[in-house]
Amino acid sequence: MNGIRWTVVLTALLSCLLIAIMIACSSPTSTSAGTQTPTTTATPKKEPVLYTGKSCFTQMTGMAARWAPDAVPFHMESALNSESNGQNGKATIWRGMFASPTRRTYKVFTCSGSRLRDEAAMGVTSGAEVAYGPTVPALMFQAFLLTADSDQAYATAQEKGGAKLMEKDPQQPVLYTLDWNPKDKALLWVVYYGSSTSQSKGIGVIDASTGKFLRAAK
């Protein structure tokens, strides 16, 4: 009789142990301390780089020399886009034209700090080599003549009437061109208060070698 009781008790204990094991196996496992839930990290937005004209001019001059050791500049201009309105003498896009007298050709170089898809890639790039016309030689100038930067030209133009235009339109776009003027025999910054050189509210002409204000126009 005692043997039967012990058998019943032992069977009951084994049944309880088996049930406990089954419950433990079927319950959801918790995440171990070593397992980490993957998290998504936001990629930081790449900001555009705004350059002054002289900064880009130096970069483009170096690239032009690799193309042709005798390459000399004969024109540079800024461009407008959603990243820069040209104020303070800075832009994300500058284009320079360099000619090789021995090749009698020129190339357009672009200095870009833009992040826009429809603009030139970041850095300095160049276009195709093209034969230049008879007017180009008279426009060529030596790179060392550029002393006053575009931000200085902007500040000078502001003092001579540009600030009044800014009061009327704080987002006033500003464009810059750099050219040798055979008549003045000087390298000139021309500051255009407008969205294009043909349609501007005011123009300031500054000597790019001395920084001196020369004249205003419309």
Question: Which sequence ranges carry the predicted segments?
Answer:
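Bacterial N-terminal signal peptides that target proteins for export
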Residues: 2-13
